[in-house]
Amino acid sequence: MSVTGNFFSKLRSLAVTLEKETGQLEQLFSSEDNEYEEESPMRVLHDLRSDIMVLKGDFQSTLNKRLARGQELSAFIKACRVLHERTAADIEQIKETFQTYGYKPQCNANSEREQTQESGKPKENGVSPNKADVEDLQALPTLEKTASTSWDILRAPQLSDFGLAHYQLPTAWEPPKVKPCKKDPEEEKPRIMLKDPEPMNVAKTPKCALRLEEDFSQIQHFGISDCSTNLNDDYTMALINKKFQKNQNVTENAAKETCQPKNLKSLLATPSHLSHRMDWVDSPLPPVFCTPGLKVHKKEKMSLPGKPAEKKGLNANNTTLPSDTCDRNDPDSAHLEDDYECTAVKPAIDFKSTSAAPAYLSLGSNINSVYSPRPPVFCTPGLKVHKKETSSVLADPTEPKGTGCTDTPPLPSFQTNWLKSDAKEKGLDITEPVPRPDLSYRQCLEEPPTLVLNSNKYEAPAMRDYCMGTPPRPEMTVSLTEDLFKYNVKPSSPPKVSEYENMLWTPVRPEMTSCITEDISQILSKYCDNNMNPADGIWDKAGAPFGKISTEYENKENRLY
């Protein structure tokens, strides 16, 4: 029983071990299958093979580059060898050429010793030198040794070497002989100094270096010593003297400028005016309007019965008035002699005379006067105007303002003697110039307007600066009977006219050439004082105020008649 029991027990244990091993193998096989489920081994093998091929290609390209570079290097080495051989051949030819001129190539002492040693030990090596080499070494020219004592071997060839010493050619091309200089010992070379030398004391501008934590400036040494104080003193004194001279010159120039009188005209004048002596900046002269070929009666002076008339003797053809024509005894006009010209009636100037005479002669001798310009004169050719007679009603021009200039002269009486006297004295002469307006009133000259415009001057009372008289009745050239003028018509006193209404001067009535009957003239003369008909406004405008003047008289040629 023991034998069978042992056999079966062993068989049983063997079966158990087999089962365990089979189980393990199955487990391993199943685990391997699970691992390769995601990626197959053929795929892995393909990836590995592709990586290997890439690496192989990179290696092959790198190897090709190396080979190409090696070939280039070998070609360069071959070219260098060829060049070396050619250079050696050229050097040999040059040596041979130079040897003909006594050139001896330099050989190092060591190489000569080696050659002698090799020649002295031929038996040891067992090789005997060739006889040809020995002959070449012994056949070196000995002439060079003897000639080396007399002249330098390395010198440039000269003419004497070729037997041409008798030709004296310039030798500027020969290099200068440099004398051998002794080498400086190594001890005399500049040494590196570890410490910089101390700088010299030089005077410099003092600088104040302030810091927040310090209350005083940093003290520095500026190189000022007892020897240099005199130089600094001289320099500072020179600066002080220079500044003092500059200030003195400035004060002298300022004193000269203050001492010079200031002239307004010289300041306003331009350099061109000053260079041509035309430093006048006065207002321009007023224009004169006149008609050539027109003869106008001369206006006479009007005064009161108690006052004597002004001196006569004025010439109508003169363009300027002499200062003697003024009444020097008259106290009212005495103060106007120096400042303004005589205030008498002055005739107008025709265009011919104005072109010949200067402009400043027609309006006075004083060029510096800045009074207001005179009013223009408007005339009509072919008309004859009466001369202004003296009237007892008109105020004296020399009287004060408000007394003489406010009265308007009445209408003159129609008398035959007046017509006869005018007809005898003057005929129809169209060459006589037109007279200027009467500017003899005192108020026209006492307060002349300034050149600068002022708003106060344009008020109502300030504009009454001009005082113009009323012209007389014009001369009638038609045949009028003497019976019509025998009636003594006494004119009534006209209303007073303010100074503002007398600003503008009414021109003298021109001569009427139309035929008017005597009856109409008589009727007009009778009713001139009682009735203010339109005809009366035409004949006499003295009593009418300035603002109510009829528009019928606006035309200077009187086209109504």
UniProtKB/Swiss-Prot annotation:
GO terms for cellular component: cytoplasm; kinetochore; meiotic spindle; mitotic spindle; outer kinetochore; spindle microtubule. It is found in: Cytoplasm, Cytoskeleton, Spindle; Chromosome, Centromere, Kinetochore. One of its GO terms (biological process) is attachment of mitotic spindle microtubules to kinetochore. Residues 111-124 have a biased composition (Basic and acidic residues). The keyword DNA-binding does not apply. Residues 105-131, 304-327, 391-413 are annotated as: Disordered. One of its GO terms (molecular function) is microtubule binding. Gene3D superfamilies: 6.10.250.1400. Its main location: cytoplasm. Keywords: Cell cycle, Cell division, Centromere, Chromosome, Cytoplasm, Cytoskeleton, Kinetochore, Microtubule, Mitosis. Component of the SKA complex, composed of ska1, ska2 and ska3. Component of the SKA complex, a microtubule plus end-binding complex of the outer kinetochore that stabilizes spindle microtubule-kinetochore attachments, promotes alignment of chromosomes at the mitotic spindle equator (chromosome congression) and assists suppression of the spindle assembly checkpoint. Kinetochores, consisting of a centromere-associated inner segment and a microtubule-contacting outer segment, play a crucial role in chromosome segregation by mediating the physical connection between centromeric DNA and spindle microtubules. PANTHER family: SPINDLE AND KINETOCHORE-ASSOCIATED PROTEIN 3. Belongs to the SKA3 family. This is SKA complex subunit 3. It comes from Xenopus tropicalis. The gene is ska3.
